Amino acid sequence: MDDSGHGERVFDLEFRAVNEELQRVRHALRNWLRDIVTDEHHAYDILLAVGEACTNSVEHGHRGDGRNLRVRATADDVQVRITIVDGGTWRVHRSLPDTDRGRGLRLMRTLVPEVNIRTSGTGTVVELATPLSA
């Protein structure tokens, strides 16, 4: 990571696709964001959006198979870009009116202005982008 304040700063973490790893990912990303995003509420929104993407990947893409996921974030003087890459299988779920499921994508789109999802036979890539300041 480049901490000089000039150029790109990078966060890169690979982890097993199991629920028990999600807390470690949130903790590591929170520490990285603390040095980059000055507005605490904006940093929390980013953290929550990434947490949703990772949780969706673990629960729906990998379904707890324990294979690896990768979170990579970059920040320059203008924005933060975060990419979550998995080798899981994308499944489209219909939202059921009386369940708590199916809100993760909507939540991500509410928290950060740019959410792009690409799926293929080899996995899913979720890209999030937001300005440094809210």
Question: Where are the model-predicted features located?
Answer:
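Heptad-repeat coiled-coil signal-transmission/dimerization helices
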Residues: 22-29, 108
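Conserved beta-strand-loop-beta-strand hairpin that lines the nucleotide-binding pocket
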Residues: 1-12, 16, 58-134
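Conserved catalytic/ATP-binding subdomain
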Residues: 20, 41-44, 67
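Conserved polar catalytic motif of the HATPase_c/GHKL fold
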Residues: 52, 56
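Conserved short strand/loop->alpha-helix "switch" segment adjacent to the catalytic nucleotide/phosphoryl-transfer site
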Residues: 26-51
